[in-house]
Amino acid sequence: MATRVLSMSARLGPVPQPPAPQDEPVFAQLKPVLGAANPARDAALFPGEELKHAHHRPQAQPAPAQAPQPAQPPATGPRLPPEDLVQTRCEMEKYLTPQLPPVPIIPEHKKYRRDSASVVDQFFTDTEGLPYSINMNVFLPDITHLRTGLYKSQRPCVTHIKTEPVAIFSHQSETTAPPPAPTQALPEFTSIFSSHQTAAPEVNNIFIKQELPTPDLHLSVPTQQGHLYQLLNTPDLDMPSSTNQTAAMDTLNVSMSAAMAGLNTHTSAVPQTAVKQFQGMPPCTYTMPSQFLPQQATYFPPSPPSSEPGSPDRQAEMLQNLTPPPSYAATIASKLAIHNPNLPTTLPVNSQNIQPVRYNRRSNPDLEKRRIHYCDYPGCTKVYTKSSHLKAHLRTHTGEKPYKCTWEGCDWRFARSDELTRHYRKHTGAKPFQCGVCNRSFSRSDHLALHMKRHQN
């Protein structure tokens, strides 16, 4: 090693300063190695050399152990003083102090990949681009290994996803019956994203329910209305109307409010069980008017047959006539209030203190004063207020029928003109007599009077 160092020093040139007797071999070995113009650059390029010299420097042999080569000329010149030698040695100690090796720089192609970016780093390497003929499905990762929060399908989703908490869904499944299975199945996805869409139905405690846009919600309202109609008309309502009518109406109001609440929540319940449950509720303290209390069913006289034609323009009117007519007294009261604003808005109904005196046509004293036309036919006691009425009555005894129907092909004759007019309406279909309550029309006035008795009761 000493021979190699001396040969390197011989090529660099003679040393200008003669070294000290003891330290001269050490400086002669180190100066050719670290004596470059830029020591920092040499240390960066050769990080191991500085450590190697620092490691071998304490073990260097003294100069007398190695004989000088005869080919090297003896050094001539003045020797350094002790002060300069100490200063030079201190300066050299700065270059000979052991330093930590710099952090090795790992090339880009040897960089360790992270787990979350392993599928991305392989597309940003410095290698040459791949030809377009290679199928890119080889480089696509498996979709099932991706997290659901980082993946979003680019295709437009066909189904509507409605998120509901799992606790609420389990509570509804306990209280209500499960709905029937839909007749139309969900669409099947054959793309590569089908495995993600058929993943676990519960993500972060959120229940994902997939359903198609069907008109089931719109069809549920009429069924609830049917339940409400059944609820009000069910025979299970055993409520006495004479003993506790107020409590019965309270129970009915509670059942109506519960049925209306069922329309909003779309919950189906059996009407009979609902009525049984509502009967156990305590009654309220308010009272109802007498006209709204349930009354005993009264006998309705049969309405005369309607001779309306089955034309399409009267179908809507016939459907309206199917509903029960309102109260006759309320209709008359509203008409009187319109014509006479000074009259009170309400009339006494079913009043027991004041009963109007009703007169028959034969016992009315006012009519008795005006009846001056008597029938002189033997055995007939008819009396009329007008002479025309008496003449028409006398034709019934004589059998005279001067009024003949003028309709083509009709040979009917009548003794009275009003009978001919009534008969002629059968040919024309005219119905001049109309009910003011339900707008039902009749061809005869007596049929209208018989129909009005249904509104009175």
From Swiss-Prot:
CDD domains: KLF5_N (cd21579). It holds the Pfam family zf-C2H2. SUPFAM superfamilies: beta-beta-alpha zinc fingers. Residues 65-80 have a biased composition (Pro residues). The keyword RNA-binding does not apply. Keywords: Activator, DNA-binding, Isopeptide bond, Metal-binding, Nucleus, Repeat, Transcription, Transcription regulation, Ubl conjugation, Zinc, Zinc-finger. Belongs to the krueppel C2H2-type zinc-finger protein family. This is Krueppel-like factor 5. It comes from Homo sapiens (Human). The lineage of its organism: Eukaryota, Metazoa, Chordata, Craniata, Vertebrata.
